Every structure is written in structure tokens, then in C-alpha cells.
Regions:
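FIC/Doc superfamily catalytic core
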Residues: 1-247
Length: 247
């Protein structure tokens, strides 16, 4: 299934894109020495890991995440699962960093490897789900979104991957638009039972770097998402229907 997103570049959105471009250019020419860049990147990795896992309910504090990032063994009673999630996310971040400057197309295999690292810490690759999943309201338990059937997931993911590689190569659309649409479509398809959000955010980071919007690796988009969580969720829930096939 081809992915042909339907969207409008409004005047307001155009102004935002111009503002983003202005800040990007300022960062690109910012005179920062190598040591400072390395330190800022390490901080960005720490914050990206903390906030992306926090969005999904991880209870570790920044100081605890920092301890794990420095090779600490954890030892936080009752938070063993949280520790594994953080360690796995660090590994997934490290993996996508090896892909930033890769001129070859992004593949479904790589996306599956990213997801596998997120969930298990292994790069063996996770198959797409084989059954139906649903997204429920965390408080009421009611179904708020019904993703596509499992039989359609491979074709939808193939279409998404083909589209994003075309955009990376041809630069038809602004990078922030491509990243946002890719994030939205991945979350909409929900190709896995768990780990979709973390994988989507990592894919977004990879796309931005591939399109020249890495911002020297010194910023954490995940921190922005977490600190604007309601707006983040609302942006992923702007469709007219609770069912994928109904729009």
C-alpha cells in the first residue's frame, strides 16, 4: 500500500517552518569546540532516553538514568523493568547513530532491529504483529483507537519506508514535515503490540539526521515531547475516526 499523506501547509505552519530553519542555521554555524559538542551530545542522549521512556511510564529519575548511562549496575529496588527499558533505549540510540551518515536507504530490517533493541536489547529484529491490537484509554479502559489489521501491516510499512526514503533522497518536503508525517503514520499503523512510541521517536530522530536536521546531536526532541505531553498526544490523535479504515 502506497503512503500518500494528505496535509496542508498553512500560513501558520509555514511561519513555524521558517522559524525552525532560522534556528537550525544558527546552530549549524555555532562555534562550539569538539569537547563541548561531545559533552552536549552525551547530555542529549541522557535526556532523550529518560524522557522517551518516561512518556511510556518509566519511573526512573534523571539521576538514575545517568547512573545507568555511565555503566552503573542500577540496583533500584522494584525498578528492574525500568532499568532494562532505559538500558535498551540507550542501545537503540547507539544503533541509530551508526545510521546517521549512511547513504543507503533506511530499510524495514533496520526498523525491526531498532524495535528489537528497544524491547529486548537485542538486534535480531522483531517481526510485525500477527494479531489485532488496540489502544485503550489508560483510565477508563475503553478503546480509543483500532489500528489496521495485521494482514495489512507489512504492506503499510513497506509503503511508509518507500515514501520516507524518497523524501530523504529528493528533499521534496521540509525535513520537519517528513519526520512528523513518518512519526504519525508509524503510530497510526502501530506495527507492534508494544514499543511503537519509542520506535517512532527513534525513527524520527534518524530521519532528521538523514535530512540535515541533526542539530549537531545536542538537542533532545524527546524532552520537548515529554514537557508538552498533551499537545504531543493530541497531534497523534487528530484523525476523524477511532478506526484506521474509517479515516
Amino acid at each position: 500500500m502506497e503512503f500518500n499523506p494528505n496535509f496542508t501547509l498553512s500560513l501558520e505552519l509555514t511561519k513555524i517552518l521558517l522559524e525552525i530553519e532560522r534556528h537550525k542555521e544558527a546552530i549549524d554555524v555555532m562555534p562550539i569546540n569538539f569537547g563541548m559538542v561531545a559533552s552536549l551530545r552525551e547530555t542529549a542522549r541522557l535526556l532523550s532516553t529518560h524522557y522517551s521512556t518516561q512518556i511510556e511510564g518509566n519511573a526512573l529519575q534523571v539521576s538514575e538514568v545517568e547512573r545507568l548511562s555511565q555503566g552503573g549496575k542500577g540496583g533500584f529496588p522494584g525498578k528492574e523493568r525500568d532499568e532494562r527499558e532505559v538500558q535498551n533505549y540507550f542501545q537503540a540510540l547507539g544503533y541509530i547513530e551508526t545510521l546517521f551518515d549512511n547513504a543507503k536507504p533506511i530499510t524495514e530490517k533496520q526498523i525491526k532491529e531498532i524495535h528489537s533493541l528497544v524491547l529486548t536489547g537485542s538486534k535480531r529484529g522483531t517481526p510485525y504483529r500477527e494479531g489485532q491490537n488496540v489502544i485503550r484509554d489508560s483510565k477508563s479502559g475503553s478503546i480509543v483507537y483500532m489500528p489496521p489489521e495485521a494482514k495489512d501491516v507489512p504492506r503499510l510499512m513497506k509503503g511508509l519506508t518507500s515514501w520516507l526514503n524518497y523524501q530523504v533522497k529528493e528533499q521534496v518536503l521540509p525535513a520537519p514535515i517528513v519526520a512528523g508525517l513518518a512519526h504519525y503514520q508509524f503510530a497510526t499503523v502501530h506495527p507492534y503490540y508494544d514499543g511503537n512510541g519509542r520506535t517512532a521517536r527513534l525513527l524520527t530522530t534518524l530521519l532528521l539526521h538523514r535530512m540535515g536536521y541533526g542539530l549537531k546531536g545536542i538537542y533532545s526532541l524527546e524532552e520537548y515531547y515529554a514537557k508538552n505531553l498533551m499537545a504531543y498526544y493530541e497531534s497523534l490523535n487528530i484523525g476523524e475516526s477511532h478506526n484506521y479504515y474509517m479515516g
